[in-house]
């Protein structure tokens, strides 16, 4: 990884949380929230991180900002290792890294005015008399300077999220982590906020890490996409490549669930079972208990590396997809009638 070309670099990043086994249990177990994640974020781009709830995407976002301390691995910002920096040493760097939170209702202090909320970063970093700058920020995000003395309860959800965006912009950061910033909003308001974020990125040369569980939202804003499952990145590549030529079965399943105006021959891939516990993850490939391309003695024994399958497109799968979309017949052929038949899928795995 080049430290001169990337704004953010993660190398073998791992985060585990110790939790009690039960009410009466004395021992503790580890929740493997993020496991051996390596990726880069380039200046001026939007990297989307997508996956089901509990896959580790929000934990990864907080690790990037050092809101959480990593268990192991390296976090670099502009080439500088910030993995083990103290909070005091990190403080000047906070100007360069900001966050937009998921819930616009709980992320704003109801006892403070909009002016106090947006102006808080200035106060923390010792900048006084920032009223004019705060009013300019409100205009920048589509609000009126007259809103300066109002309280959060006087605004709609979309307006509250704009206040959160203004707060994130206050110190002119280079990186903004957007943790599902539109998931709590109506669809029509989602589009407005996404358009705002795109325009701000162009105007201020911002870099985004955009977290979402919704692939249709990610597609509208991301330049590259990383797909996470059970704490690991299973696929990463350019947005167009991920959507048009997914290589990992999990990515294909997520894409098949995105509503489309016309099916166009694309079939729905329904995964069996639930997401395994991050306390006791499956051996080798963590996706193998739910995978329609499971090969006994291989997928459950050997962990697939995240390997490049085409320029800029990598997937962690022993048997990556070669065809997309798939028809109902092809999916049935790959899945087999019963789990017991899966060891015999070797012949069909290479046909898909």
Where is each model-derived feature located?
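Short catalytic/signature loops enriched in Gly
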Residues: 4-6, 19-25, 30, 238-345, ...
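ABC-type ATPase nucleotide-binding domains, specifically the catalytic core motifs of the NBD
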Residues: 18-27, 69, 84-90, 105, ...
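Conserved ABC transporter NBD signature motif
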Residues: 73-81
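Conserved ABC ATPase "signature" region
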Residues: 81, 129-146, 255
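Conserved ABC ATPase signature
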Residues: 151-155, 159
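A short, proline-enriched helix->beta-strand linker immediately N-terminal to the Walker B motif
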Residues: 170-174
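P-loop NTP-binding/switch modules centered on Walker-like glycine-rich loops
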Residues: 175-177, 181, 185, 189-267
């Amino acid at each position: 990884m080049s430290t001169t070309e990337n704004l953010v670099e993660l190398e073998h990043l791992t985060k585990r949380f110790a939790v009690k086994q039960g009410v009466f249990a004395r021992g503790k177990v580890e929740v493997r929230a993020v496991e051996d994640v390596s990726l880069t974020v380039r200046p001026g781009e939007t990297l989307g991180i997508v996956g089901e709830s509990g896959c580790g995407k929000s934990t990864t976002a907080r690790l990037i900002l050092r809101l959480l301390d990593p268990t192991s691995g390296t976090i670099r910002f502009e080439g500088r290792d910030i993995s083990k920096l103290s909070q005091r040493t990190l403080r000047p760097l906070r100007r360069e890294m900001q966050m937009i939170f998921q819930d616009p209702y709980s992320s704003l202090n109801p006892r403070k005015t909009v002016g106090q909320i947006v102006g808080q970063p200035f106060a923390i970093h010792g900048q006084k008399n920032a009223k004019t700058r705060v009013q300019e920020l409100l205009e920048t995000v589509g609000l009126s300077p007259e809103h300066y003395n109002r309280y959060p309860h006087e605004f709609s959800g979309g307006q509250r999220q704009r206040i959160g965006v203004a707060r994130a912009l206050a110190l002119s950061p280079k990186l903004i982590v957007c943790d599902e910033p539109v998931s709590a909003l109506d669809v029509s308001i989602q589009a407005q906020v996404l358009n705002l974020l795109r325009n701000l990125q162009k105007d201020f040369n911002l870099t985004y890490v955009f977290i979402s569980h919704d692939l249709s939202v990610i597609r509208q804003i991301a330049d590259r996409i990383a797909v996470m499952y059970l704490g690991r990145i299973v696929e990463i590549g350019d947005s167009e490549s991920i959507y048009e030529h997914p290589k990992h079965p999990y990515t294909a399943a997520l894409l098949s669930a995105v509503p489309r105006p016309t099916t166009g021959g694309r079939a729905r891939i329904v995964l069996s079972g639930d997401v395994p516990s991050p306390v006791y993850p499956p051996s080798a490939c963590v996706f193998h208990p739910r995978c329609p391309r499971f090969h006994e003695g291989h997928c459950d024994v050997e962990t697939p590396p995240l390997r490049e399958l085409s320029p800029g497109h990598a997937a962690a799968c022993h048997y990556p997809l070669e065809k997309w979309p798939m028809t109902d017949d092809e999916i049935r052929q790959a899945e087999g009638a019963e789990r017991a038949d899966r060891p015999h899928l070797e012949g069909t795995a290479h046909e898909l």
